[in-house]
Amino acid sequence: MSIRLICSDIDGTLLQYGKKELEDEIFEQIRELHRRGILFCPASGRQYTSLRKLFAPVADCCVFLCENGGVIYKDEQCIAKNPMPRALAEEIANDLWTRSDGQGEVMLSGQNTAYLMERGLGMLKRIQFIGNNYQIIHDPSEVPEEITKVSVYLHEGVESYTERFVPRWKEANCAVAGPYWIDTTIAHKSIGVRSICKTLDIDLADVMAFGDNYNDVSMLDIVGVPYIMDGAAAPLREKYPNHTPRPEDVLREFLKQN
């Protein structure tokens, strides 16, 4: 096994919740990995615009897995896209909106724009905080392009709604994506990683990946070297033997030893 690709979830993994900028160390590590012929992949539910801004100093050294695998970018070009069936996306969006007791706001993701159905509960501020392109809509039918992901933002937390939505939309890979988000998508991170590996002729055994939540499981399950964050839920820490508080700690040792 020779690591050729390193994938990392962002929020809750490489970027702790509430932080807006990455540490300088990760940029130095990505540059050194690139010099050694190892590609770094931010693997996130965020859109491309947000990820490219976040990784601006090293963006040309990265391949970007966006929208949980719904869209893949390399060298500023979309190299793969996995949209949801339109009728299913609209049905899910309407369900998340109407069955969240007035406590949820809905985001429908296009290739590089977030379409927001908001109630003034905080979603808009969060989307502005991470730097997404966005547009306010009032109905899912207003989205003028293919939809890659449908999410609900629950401003009081996901706990009361996980059992309501996750089993119901299992066909759309419904999963908790953070303290306030539940995501649905036909794609998932493993589809994105497989697309990257196929395009770049990389064996899955030669991939290292980091994650902290249930929407990272599909990615962690297929790579040769998966790491779960120390702050992840107990079932995830039990599932994966490799734990770390920070991806940078693992990468620092990896670069020393290789």
Which sequence ranges carry the predicted segments?
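Short hydrophobic/aromatic-enriched beta-strand-loop microsegments
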Residues: C61-E67, N82, R126-Q128, C174-A175, ...
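Asp-based phosphoryl-transfer active-site loop
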Residues: R4-K19, L220
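Mg2+-dependent phosphoryl-transfer enzymes with acidic/Ser/Thr/Gly-rich catalytic loops
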Residues: M1-L5, E23, I182-N258
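Conserved acidic, metal-coordinating active-site core of Asp-based
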Residues: R99-F210, Y214-M219, G231
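Short active-site oxyanion
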Residues: G37-C41, D60-C62, T148-V150, A205-V207, ...
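Hydrophobic packing residues within well-ordered alpha-helices of enzyme cores
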Residues: L51-F55, T162, M219, L236
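Short, structured coil segments at secondary-structure junctions
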Residues: P57-D60, N68, P167-K170, I222-V223, ...
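Active-site phosphate-binding/coordination module
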Residues: E21-G122
